Amino acid sequence: LMAGTTNAPSAYDPVTQPELAKNRMDWVLTKMLEEKFITKAQYDQAVATPIASMLHVSESPAGCGAAGSAAYFCSYVVNEVLSSENFGPDVASRRQLLTRGGLKITTTLNLQRQSAADNVIQSNVPTGDASGTDTTIASIEPGTGRIQALAQNSNYGDGGPDSSDTQLVYAADAKHGGIELSDGTVGFQPGSTFKALILAEWFKEGNSAGAGLSAVPRTFQWNIPCAPENNDPTWAPKNVDPSLNRSTNVTEATKMSINVAYAEMLSRMDVCAVTNFASSIGVTKADGTPLDARPSIVLGSQNVPPLSMANAYATFASGGKYCK
C-alpha cells in the first residue's frame, strides 16, 4: 500500500481515494509476484485484505497546532507576517506568501525557556483548571527585545466544544492575536506590577528611595493637567493588609507593595508624566496612545498586553534600553 502511494500521494491517498489506492496496491503486488519477491499465497492474502483494515488514522494537529507548547509563539509569528505590509499589500497576498512563497523564517524562540514557561503554568494553573483563570507567561531578552517564550493555559484550537481551545494569544496585542476588549483595550490588568513604572518616573523626577510616606488610607489631590476631568478627589485606595496603614518610605513601600504609599507618590507627581513614561517603554492602549491619566493607574487598573509589561521590565533590566 505504501509503495503504491509514493508516485502520487494525493491521487492514491487510501483515506480519501480508497478505490484508487487499492487498484494501485494490487498492481504493485502483481509486479512483486512476477519478480518472485512474494509467493502466490502471499499475493492472494494481500489482495484479499481490505484497505480499511490497514488504516489506523489519527488526526494530527495542523499549522501552529503542531508546534505543541510553542503554538502561541508560532501564532504570534504568523500574525506578524499577516499584519505587516512588508509581506504584501493585503492579508490575502501575505497569506499566499506565507503558505506558498518558500519563506525561511528564523524566530527568537528559546526552547529551554519555552519548556520552562509551560511547565510553570501547567504546574500551577493548568489547562482546564477549575478556577477558570486565564494564565500566560511571556519572556523577553533584555537589550534585544527578542521574545523567547510564550506560554498559556489553553489548547491551541478554534474554540470548538472544548472551552480550553482558543487561538487567542493572551500575552499579545490585538495585531498579534491578543484579546481586544469592548473598551478598546487589550490584555489584562497588570495590577501591582505597574508600580515599577511609577517608581521609575519617581526617580526620573529626582526623588529618592528614602523619602518618607504615609500609608494611612485617605483621599489625595491629583495633578493631571492633560486630563483634569479625571481628577477624582473622592478616590481613596486601601491597603490589602491593614497592618501596613502606617508611616513608611519608598524602599519599604516597594518591597511590601503598599498601595496607599504608592498613591501618595503618584499624588506628588504629574500623572500625565507617568502615562507618557509608560508609553516611552511600550505600555500603551491598543491604538498606541498613552494610557488614561487617572489616579487608579497606580494600582494597574488599565488593561495592557502582558508582553508589553514584560518588555517594560526588560527595559529596566537592560539599563534603560527599550527595544520594540
Model-found features: residue ranges?
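Extracytoplasmic/secreted proteins, especially bacterial periplasmic and envelope-associated proteins
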Residues: 1, 20-33, 45, 68, ...
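Non-catalytic, structured segments within soluble enzyme domains
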Residues: 1-108, 115, 284, 290, ...
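Generic structural signal for hydrophobic core residues of well-folded globular domains
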Residues: 3-9, 36, 81, 201-202, ...
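Thr-Gly-centered strand-to-loop micro-motif
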Residues: 264-265, 299
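Short pre-catalytic segments that frame enzyme active sites
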Residues: 10-14, 49, 95-101, 111, ...
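Helix N-cap / loop-to-helix initiation motif
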Residues: 38-39, 110, 270, 305
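Structured alpha-helical segments in the cores of large, soluble enzyme domains
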Residues: 81-89, 270-279
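Sequence contexts marking disulfide-bonded cysteines in secreted/extracellular proteins
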Residues: 63-65, 73-75, 225-227, 271, ...
